[in-house]
């Protein structure tokens, strides 16, 4: 099965969407899948207003169609609702090609945190985007319930995983700071609610790993905190294992892969009792979820570190990829069955056919 994944979120961005898609690409051969990423890479790009580190593609439908046709996918998955996502969606609809989508971000809440735009407007925008999809993949039951309450249909569950070979307890600390060390990892942006963590009266040290548009302002406002910038791989894993409590102040995440990474590292978690943490830690003793984040952080110091390890072992990227590609195969089978029922001529290939036009002048590639 040849699968094209269209996404506006890709390297050099570091976030849960990119990490999830990278893991799906890595696991693809295990499921007989040949993946291809359609990303902003290769197109002219511009920084997103209020978030210049995120680059969006200045692409045209013709040039996106050319990229799709060159690969010849059996199935298309659209991961994001940006320019790449909308153009790919338009091509799929024009060619009557089955596609799936995924819902990674609580877009209405993110928009409302930055601009005075009613959430109802954002949900209307999202329903239009995801409505024609054969299935909309979401990470948790809570996200599924939220979308159903706003009129979404054909919702599919797609869980997330953690790399236990990378994220695990380590005997030596790489952080020479007063203890206890309270750690937060993620994008440093207003929607992550980091100020709720940094303003807490806590003993020891506060450490923030990540980068983003709010970093400079937060560093000025909280000079006692340690901002380490973006970290990945062994460097990031060692920081997790060197800390004492992971504090997750976000109120808008759909899941939070960093929660699993912290748990796998033996790090107790403190968070608000909201969507994301409530789903990940349901029935687990690996976290303290409380409206008083300071109380949660201090209580988390007393949690058994083994609880997080037990939780993390139930989440593998292999099972995540099995769900991901399984949904696509079933979408293809359902579409094929529908065509057979209508007695339509069977195509020579399920690959997408796109009429190509010669480029005129300089193209966006």
Indicate residue ranges for each PLM-predicted region.
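Nucleotide-sugar donor phosphate/pyrophosphate-binding loop at the beta->alpha transition
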Residues: 98-100, 109-128
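Short alpha-helical donor nucleotide-sugar binding micro-motif in glycosyltransferases
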Residues: 130, 230, 238-243
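Conserved donor-binding/catalytic core segment of Leloir-type glycosyltransferases
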Residues: 174-207
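A charged, aromatic-enriched C-terminal amphipathic alpha-helix characteristic of glycosyltransferases
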Residues: 302-337, 341-343
């Amino acid at each position: 099965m040849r699968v094209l994944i269209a996404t506006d979120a890709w390297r050099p961005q570091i976030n849960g969407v990119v990490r999830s898609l990278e893991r799906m690409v890595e696991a693809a051969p295990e499921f007989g899948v040949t993946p291809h990423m359609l990303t902003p890479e290769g197109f002219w790009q511009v920084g997103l207003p209020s978030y210049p580190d995120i680059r969006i593609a200045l692409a045209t439908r013709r040039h996106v169609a050319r990229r799709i046709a060159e690969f010849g996918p059996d199935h298309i998955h659209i991961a994001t609702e940006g320019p790449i996502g909308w153009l790919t969606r338009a091509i799929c609809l024009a060619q009557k090609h089955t596609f799936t989508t995924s819902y990674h971000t609580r877009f209405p809440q993110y928009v409302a945190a930055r601009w005075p735009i009613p959430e109802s407007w954002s949900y209307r925008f999202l329903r239009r985007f995801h409505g024609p999809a054969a299935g909309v993949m979401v990470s948790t039951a809570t996200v599924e319930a939220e979308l159903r309450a706003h009129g979404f249909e054909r919702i599919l569950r797609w869980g997330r995983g953690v790399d236990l070979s990378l994220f695990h307890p380590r005997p030596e600390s790489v952080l020479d700071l007063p203890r206890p060390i309270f750690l937060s990892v993620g994008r440093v942006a207003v929607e992550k609610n980091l100020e709720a963590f940094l303003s807490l009266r806590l003993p020891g040290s506060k450490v923030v790993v990540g980068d983003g548009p709010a970093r400079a302002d937060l560093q000025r406002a909280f000079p006692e905190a340690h901002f380490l910038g973006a970290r990945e791989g062994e460097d990031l894993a060692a920081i997790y294992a060197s800390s004492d409590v992971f504090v997750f102040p976000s109120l808008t995440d759909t899941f939070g892969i960093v929660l699993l990474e912290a748990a796998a590292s033996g790090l107790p978690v403190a968070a608000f009792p909201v969507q994301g943490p409530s789903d990940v830690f349901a029935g687990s003793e690996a976290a303290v979820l409380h409206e008083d984040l300071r109380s949660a952080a201090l209580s988390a110091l007393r949690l058994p570190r083994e609880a997080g390890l037990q939780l993390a072992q139930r989440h593998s990227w292999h099972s995540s990829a099995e769900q991901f590609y399984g949904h696509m195969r079933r979408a293809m089978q359902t579409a094929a069955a529908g065509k057979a029922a209508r007695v339509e001529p069977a195509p020579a290939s399920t690959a997408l056919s796109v009429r190509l036009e010669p480029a005129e002048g300089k193209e966006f590639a």
